[in-house]
């Protein structure tokens, strides 16, 4: 119906004849971009007994966008920090998002379309960059005039990796908008959501077997937010839904969405009505990011619910749900990428050997199991295959430790990551290794950041738990 044609039709409540319009079959569908309210004036007719010709007029108001039960937060890229911790915007996060949304095109530069409403955004906050200018606040009136290069070619260009956010206060979410450009003019506009809470909002993780639905962990989400902010949430808004290849998140009998504010409690439209149903045959990791809202609908923080869908849950006696690497170890063990000791333990704090790390990296990259080529040397087959494929050179000691540099070099080669097209500015001050840079650009490894300086510590060794995190990211990057 159009607005003009509504007045020429009658809509019946209750019994009606064939061909009449039922009142309860009227639906209003708002345009996707519409935010506001629609008013429909009506006259209702009826009565009882001898008073059957009564009528009353009224107005029906349908509100969208700012109405109760609806939320409009957006976060294509999401960060969490605390009131006293400066947040460095990761240029590689933006570059990966750009590639994802353009099916592989490279980010060349971006401009800011908005700045955070709370807190302050700076360029070159620590005054350590040789690109662009000295420390410069970026305000609503100035930010849009600066072009930030992903790979600056001269000192006059502004380096995208030098954007720093300084919080102001606690328990809020704010955002930063941008438009990225490729060399051929392709554009992507997106939003960075920044959550500032008294302490980080803990990830809520659960694991399920293949084909088994999972109820949304409403109570755990409530506890995680309350612990981080000191306040109880009233509702949440989902920021992203599971990929279609993974499964469907339902609210009752209908697919969930990213605009509804799902209340904490029971009943229709509540968090307790959310459940994830994985697709038949799917195994892997699913992340469901959200913002936590107070009773006024204002965000007080952001978090994530993660679900591991596995063939079977394999457990180790020394790895519990509170162990920091529980997610990585559980999913990798189920995928037969990682294993423990004969006594049923995993020993996540033990230093990992070169041979054990080599095996994990190759399996995560898609290599098959390699039988020993030397009697009594468990990992000799992996070393032989790695040498043949150019992943390793020389004769490393398989029972000795492996360094962070060696891990990065083997992993980047195993994943066949490109070492061309990387930013001109190196991400770390203590290594110029291109494989380290490629793996960092892929989001698989990170460094140590302090007062404007990032280091990688290439000669440090790693524990079994630390390598499980790297291998998990590798495996998920190739799914």
How would you name each of these model-derived features?
Residues 36, 223, 284, 339, ...:
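Active-site micro-motifs of SAM-dependent methyltransferase domains
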Residues 1-311:
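Extracellular glycosylation-rich, acidic/polar low-complexity regions of adhesion-
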Residues 173-177, 190, 286, 303-305, ...:
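Short flexible/disordered coil segments
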């Amino acid at each position: 119906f159009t607005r003009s044609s509504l007045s020429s039709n009658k809509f019946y409540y209750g019994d009606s004849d064939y061909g009449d319009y039922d009142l309860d079959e009227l639906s209003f569908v708002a345009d996707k971009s519409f935010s506001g309210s629609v008013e429909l004036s009506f006259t209702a007719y009826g009565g009882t007994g001898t008073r059957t010709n009564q009528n009353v007029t009224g107005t029906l108001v349908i509100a969208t966008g700012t109405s109760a039960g609806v939320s409009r937060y957006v976060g294509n890229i999401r960060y969490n920090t605390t009131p006293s911790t400066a947040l460095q915007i990761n240029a590689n996060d933006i570059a990966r998002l750009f590639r994802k949304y353009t099916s592989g095109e490279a980010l060349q530069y971006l401009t800011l379309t908005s700045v955070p409403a709370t807190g302050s955004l700076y360029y070159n906050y620590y005054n350590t960059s040789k690109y662009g200018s000295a420390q410069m606040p970026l305000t609503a009136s100035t930010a849009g005039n600066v072009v930030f290069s992903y790979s600056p070619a001269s000192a006059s260009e502004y380096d995208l990796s030098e954007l720093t956010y300084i919080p102001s206060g606690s328990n809020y979410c704010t955002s930063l908008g941008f438009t990225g450009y490729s060399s051929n003019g392709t554009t992507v506009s997106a939003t960075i959501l920044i959550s500032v809470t008294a302490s980080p909002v803990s990830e809520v993780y659960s694991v399920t077997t293949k084909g088994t639905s999972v109820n949304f962990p409403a109570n755990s989400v409530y506890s995680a937010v309350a612990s981080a902010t000191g306040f109880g949430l009233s509702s949440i808004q989902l920021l992203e839904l599971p990929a279609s290849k993974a499964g469907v998140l339902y609210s009752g009998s209908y697919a969930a969405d990213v605009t509804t504010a799902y209340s904490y409690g029971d009943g229709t439209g509540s968090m307790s009505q959310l459940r994830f149903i994985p697709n038949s045959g799917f195994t892997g990791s699913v992340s469901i990011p959200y913002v936590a809202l107070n009773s006024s609908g204002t965000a007080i923080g952001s978090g994530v619910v993660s679900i591991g869908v596995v063939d079977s849950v394999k457990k180790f006696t020394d790895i519990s749900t509170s162990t920091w690497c529980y997610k990585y170890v559980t999913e990798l063990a189920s995928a037969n990428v990682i294993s423990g000791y004969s006594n049923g333990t995993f020993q996540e704090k033990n230093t990992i050997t070169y041979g054990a790390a080599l095996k994990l990296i190759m399996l995560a990259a898609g290599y098959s199991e390699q039988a020993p080529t030397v009697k009594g040397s468990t990992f000799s087959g992996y070393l032989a295959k790695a040498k043949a494929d150019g992943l390793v050179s020389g004769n490393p000691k398989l029972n000795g430790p492996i360094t962070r540099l060696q891990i990065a070099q083997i992993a980047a080669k195993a994943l066949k990551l490109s070492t061309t097209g990387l930013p001109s500015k190196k991400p770390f001050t203590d290594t110029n290794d291109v494989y380290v840079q490629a793996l960092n650009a892929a989001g698989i490894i990170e460094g140590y950041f302090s007062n404007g300086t990032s280091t990688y510590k290439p000669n440090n060794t790693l524990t079994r738990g630390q390598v499980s995190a790297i291998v998990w990211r590798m495996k998920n990057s190739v799914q």
